[in-house]
Design a protein with these regions (language model features):
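Charged structural interfaces that engage phosphate-rich ligands
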Residues: 1-750
């Protein structure tokens, strides 16, 4: 665990499915570019940039089709390479498994840090339940309220169907949603007890009793929650308003570029001050959000996307903010007031709310101080979400008066403050008084252990080689004094060497910033290459066969055949690798339950009104007719299973069909409906079942048997194709008799 949460152990075995998915995804990209080569570009302004699942028909270019087949063959008959050496020992691999299975402890990463925190499960549970027992903030539910939320969401979508495109409506309906989890992350950087213990320790870890001043950051909305797709849309529509807020800063570099310049004789008059909003998200009420967003949209109406209006935004925000639901320890909750801290639009609306309140701040400063000080505050009060900073001039009067104004902006929005005549930290920057100007240095929290990504981690090499570059650039952007900059780079080199980076790699990265002024780095705009790129995306796994070289040779031969006027003449093929599971994802789980883990296999959901339960047999193995070996199910499934491969069996003869689905319950409903339909293009299958199983009370059963990790149609179709070829289901063969398999297949599974 001393390697840090970002460290990736070498995967145990080759991932052949990943390679097949990567190749299928690449050939689809090539086919799309070929298909649309003579079509005008789509100029429709799509605020969500929704990805399409469209699969183009086969090209009439025979050479192109041959090259596509050659690329597809690289993923066939793949033989695993011999496993490479692991980057952790067998004992460490066993320790990971032991930690995963230990129910007496819970592992979390620190809030704003790179450290692991191990706590007693009972302590973590008590701290979370202490929070959830605040009845003014949270409400308990006897059963999962997500279905109610989805009904409200669908009503909203239908009401505004004239505004939304077809793709947007399908996207917002979010069929792959999951119940959010309530999670708490320890704020160890806020604990004086922990900071003191870390500073006095030379070990890779510290062990101590529970510090009485340890606080937590609570997250109660997830990236897959029912309303998160709507939250994404609202976020994209509201973000253009953020630069209109005078105090808004995007990141530390934006803050550096907006740092005021003072004359030498003004330096003694400066007081550095920072202000932090206490529990901001919990105290931003929905009514305040509506007022704030309405103000900004009405003030800058041209910034709103032309297809959308204020009513859509306001009603949409109500759906997102008033329906934040989540679970903890098998109990269901909803947020009663405030803003969900995990929903995507939360930081944007927090900025808009504070920007709205700051209009009152400026007016009160003018009344209590004067107009010149008001102009100064508008120009120099800067805020990163809930953290504010100002270089206050003592000649203006008592800074506490300014703090009082801040704390009177809203009854629930309260600020704490720190100030200093000499220096102060803000974000990752230390501000201090130089001889003639404000100087900046990089700031590390007292609990920062400088455990950067170890070079032994199973990351792509270019990712690891870029770590020193990124860290060195940050130092050279922030540190204004050249001598201190050299000192900070020397410290960084020491820490990187401890993490396994080679000296020559570090120095090569550092040389990129030699003799470059920090102001030039802050203002540097990265130019983009105009050449189009098609990206081959695969999981980084040293155990996987390396097929990209073969694919690139085939692609280059295609370009050579087409010549300078060809479809791909200005296109390059590059490889991007996703990182495997890191220690953070292996050791910490969002889902929390004191109950025993659900066993592998298929179970009915037992919901009284569920129409799907009767079609799902309870089992932990799958029997494929004609195959003697049983398939062992390695996940827990019920009627609500999502993103799965399933088997549908005729109850009359046990012949079967293999399919894929995003939502099993909806798929069962679709199959049941098509048994009664006379207009289906794939009626042969349903004719078979309705005739063969006519004397059966239940004509077919469905068993989900494989969980697809990647939530994409390409992944599901690739793995479905693998199982179809492996088990040769008779009911699937109806499709092979038809020329346009993909379209018929899609009609069955829609």
């Amino acid at each position: 665990m001393s390697k840090g949460p970002k460290f990736c152990p070498t995967p145990n075995s080759p991932d052949i499915f990943d390679l097949k998915i990567a190749v299928k995804d690449l050939t689809r990209k090539l086919e799309l570019q070929k298909h649309f080569e003579n079509s005008p570009s789509n100029t429709e302004d799509d605020p969500l940039k929704i990805k399409s699942n469209y699969v183009p028909p086969q090209s009439s270019d025979m050479v192109f089709n041959t090259k596509i087949k050659e690329i597809k063959k690289t993923a066939e008959n793949i033989q695993p390479v011999r496993p490479t050496h692991y980057n952790i020992t067998a004992g460490e691999r066993n320790a990971i498994t032991s930690l995963q299975n230990n129910k007496d402890i819970i592992v979390k990463t620190a809030d704003k840090g790179s450290s692991f925190i191990i706590m007693d499960t009972s302590y973590y549970k008590s701290k979370v339940e202490e929070r959830l027992n605040l009845t003014d903030l949270y409400k308990t539910h006897e059963k999962n309220p997500d279905n109610i939320v989805m009904n409200r969401l669908n009503t909203f979508i239908n009401k505004h169907k004239s505004i939304l495109t077809k793709k947007e409506k399908l996207y917002l309906k979010n069929p792959n949603y999951k119940t959010s989890n309530f999670v708490a992350y320890p704020k160890i950087h806020k604990s004086k007890f922990i900071a003191e213990k870390v500073q006095n320790s030379n070990s890779n870890y510290i062990q101590m009793p529970i510090p009485p001043d340890l606080k937590f950051r609570f997250i109660h909305a997830g990236p897959c929650s029912p309303t998160n797709k709507l939250s994404e849309l609202l976020d994209s529509l509201l973000k253009p308003y953020l630069p209109k807020i005078p105090s808004y800063i995007k990141d530390y570099n934006d803050f550096l570029n907006k740092l005021p310049n003072y004359e030498k004789n003004e330096m003694d008059d400066i007081l550095f001050a920072t202000c932090d909003i206490v529990d901001m998200y919990s105290n931003i009420e929905v009514d305040l959000v509506i007022k704030s967003v309405t103000y900004w949209i009405c003030k800058f109406p041209t910034l709103l996307h032309s297809r959308f209006n204020l009513d859509f935004i306001i009603e949409g925000l109500g759906i997102v903010l008033k329906n934040a639901t989540f679970q903890f320890n098998n109990k269901f909750y909803s947020l009663q007031c405030g803003t969900g801290t995990g929903t995507q639009v939360a930081p944007t609306i927090a900025n808009l709310v504070m920007g709205y309140l700051e209009i009152t701040l400026y007016e009160k400063v003018k009344i209590i101080f004067d107009e010149n000080i008001q102009k100064y505050v508008i120009q120099n009060w800067k805020r990163f979400i809930d953290d504010g900073q100002i270089c206050w001039k003592n000649s203006f009067g008592d800074f506490n008066k300014f703090l009082e104004i801040l704390n009177e902006l809203h009854p629930k929005i309260k600020f704490t403050s720190e100030s200093s005549e000499e220096e102060i930290s803000f974000l990752n920057i230390l501000l201090y008084k130089g001889k003639s100007q404000i100087e900046t240095d990089i700031y590390y929290k007292k609990t920062d252990t400088h455990d950067y990504l170890p070079y032994s981690s199973s990351h792509p090499r270019h990712t690891k080689n870029n770590v020193p570059t990124t860290l060195a650039r940050m130092i050279c952007q922030i540190v204004s004094d050249e001598e201190i900059r050299e000192k900070r780079l020397h410290e960084l080199k020491h820490w990187l060497l401890k993490s396994g980076y080679k000296s020559e790699v570090i120095l090569n990265c550092f040389q990129k910033f030699e003799n470059v002024d920090c102001k030039d780095l802050r203002n540097k705009v990265i130019s983009e290459n105009e050449e189009e790129k098609i990206v081959f995306i695969q999981l980084h796994n040293p155990n996987n066969p390396q097929i990209f070289g073969k694919i690139k040779n085939i692609f280059n031969s295609l370009k050579e055949y087409e010549g300078v006027e060809g479809t791909f003449s200005n296109t390059s093929l590059i490889k991007a690798e996703k990182q495997p599971l890191n220690l953070g994802r292996l050791l910490q789980k969002s889902f929390f339950s004191m109950e025993p883990r659900l066993p592998h296999g298929v179970k009915k959901c037992q919901y009284k009104k569920c129409d799907a339960c009767k079609y799902i047999p309870e089992t932990n193995v799958v029997n494929f007719k004609g195959h003697h070996k049983l398939f062992l199910i390695k996940n827990h499934f019920d009627c609500n299973a999502k993103n799965v491969i399933y088997k549908i069996s005729c109850m009359g003869c046990d012949e079967f069909y293999i399919g894929e689905t995003v939502n099993l319950k909806q798929r069962i409903s679709g199959h049941k409906h098509k048994l009664l339909s006379e207009e289906s293009d794939v009626q042969k299958i349903y004719n078979h079942i309705s005739f063969c199983a006519k004397n059966c009370n239940i004509p077919f059963t469905i068993v989900p048997f494989y969980q697809v990790k990647e939530e994409s149609l390409t992944a599901r179709l690739t793995i479905e194709e693998y199982f179809i070829k492996k088990y040769n289901p008779k009911l699937n063969t109806y499709f092979y008799e038809k020329p346009n398999f993909s379209n018929k297949k899609r009609k069955l599974d829609e």
